[in-house]
């Protein structure tokens, strides 16, 4: 019988967890896009996050909150505007910035999706106890810090000519 090698097991688990982030995102998008009728999963997320602000957020704020580029958010917002779900208006603070304001039609979509949202959360977390959800929430916060460390690591590698 081989001796137990914790280091190998931990490294393997890190690799699985890392790739799992991508797999989980892909699965979530594929499932939701298959069943959402009027908008994509990403468009819905942009609307829900924009609606959470007291005042319409600008594209850069949404990009930062959603972890993607401003250009990506603009592309999603333009398609939502064409469908009548949002209005893109110049920021009062900076006329060069565009703010995403949810229209009445968009608010209707968000309101109608609240039941869906409950079912999504209920399904995804069905096998979790409240304690496990609290722990997962805590660990997700640590993972978010890890993304910051990863960004710094890549930046330093690039500055040092390692990339």
Where are the predicted features?
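N-terminal helix-turn-helix DNA-binding core of bacterial DNA-binding proteins
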Residues: 29-71, 83
